[in-house]
Amino acid sequence: MAKKEDTIVLEGRVQELLPGMHFKILLENGMPVTAHLCGKMRMSNIRLLVGDRVTVEMSAYDLTKARVVYRHR
């Protein structure tokens, strides 16, 4: 697992729902990424819909995958 120093935190919007609790997110900088829910969001049964604004964490080593850590209201 990556250290906290190696993660990049960005915001974006859910563009598409993919199978297996994966999502296509369009970041604020215009870059699309594939993301999955973090464990606490899965345990809390938090669901995402198209158009939701989210905060994602990305590894500095793979900028195509991300983890959704927060859904904005």
Swiss-Prot record:
Disulfide bonds: none annotated. CDD domains: S1_IF1. Keywords: Cytoplasm, Initiation factor, Protein biosynthesis, RNA-binding, rRNA-binding. InterPro entries: NA-bd_OB-fold, RNA-binding_domain_S1_IF1, S1_domain, TIF_IF1. One of its GO terms (cellular component) is cytosol. It comes from the Bacteria. GO terms for molecular function: ribosome binding; rRNA binding; translation initiation factor activity. Residues 1-73 form the S1-like domain. Signal peptide: none annotated. It is found in: Cytoplasm. Gene3D superfamilies: Nucleic acid-binding proteins. It holds the Pfam family eIF-1a. Belongs to the IF-1 family. One of the essential components for the initiation of protein synthesis. Stabilizes the binding of IF-2 and IF-3 on the 30S subunit to which N-formylmethionyl-tRNA(fMet) subsequently binds. Helps modulate mRNA selection, yielding the 30S pre-initiation complex (PIC). Upon addition of the 50S ribosomal subunit IF-1, IF-2 and IF-3 are released leaving the mature 70S translation initiation complex. Component of the 30S ribosomal translation pre-initiation complex which assembles on the 30S ribosome in the order IF-2 and IF-3, IF-1 and N-formylmethionyl-tRNA(fMet); mRNA recruitment can occur at any time during PIC assembly. This is Translation initiation factor IF-1. It comes from Chlamydia felis (strain Fe/C-56). The gene is infA.
